[in-house]
């Protein structure tokens, strides 16, 4: 089980990303727009750099929803590989079967 503080940090990052998503998209559109003046695009770049670091979605880490494990997490299920294995053996994930060939 991951430390609760790390899980809460990720939750805080997710809220920050959600809060600044529209503003980041607006500034990025200004920066990418070639028809705008260089000064205007430069100002938009400075404003984008002034936003909090955690406002960038790239800083988010996928974690297991049960244990908080940061590695070996499957996006489809939102669970760590070890928990997927346990739950799948109990038959609680519909359509998931053990591979055999």
UniProtKB/Swiss-Prot annotation:
Pfam families: Ribosomal_S14 (PF00253). GO terms for biological process: translation. InterPro entries: Ribosomal_uS14, Ribosomal_uS14_bac/plastid. It comes from the Bacteria. Keywords: Ribonucleoprotein, Ribosomal protein, RNA-binding, rRNA-binding. One of its GO terms (cellular component) is small ribosomal subunit. GO terms for molecular function: rRNA binding; structural constituent of ribosome. Coiled coil: none annotated. NCBIfam families: PRK08881.1. Belongs to the universal ribosomal protein uS14 family. Part of the 30S ribosomal subunit. Contacts proteins S3 and S10. Binds 16S rRNA, required for the assembly of 30S particles and may also be responsible for determining the conformation of the 16S rRNA at the A site. HAMAP family: Ribosomal_uS14_1. This is Small ribosomal subunit protein uS14. It comes from Polynucleobacter necessarius subsp. necessarius (strain STIR1). The gene is rpsN.
């Amino acid at each position: 089980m991951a430390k609760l503080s790390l899980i809460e940090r990720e939750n805080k990052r997710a809220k920050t990303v959600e809060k600044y998503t529209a503003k980041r998209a607006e500034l990025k559109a200004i920066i990418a727009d070639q028809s705008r003046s260089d000064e205007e695009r430069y100002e938009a770049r400075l404003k984008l750099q002034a936003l909090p670091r955690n406002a960038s979605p790239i800083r988010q880490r996928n974690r297991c929803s049960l244990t908080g494990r940061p590695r070996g997490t499957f996006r489809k299920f939102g669970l760590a590989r070890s928990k997927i294995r346990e739950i799948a053996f109990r038959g609680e994930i519909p359509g998931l079967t053990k591979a055999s060939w």
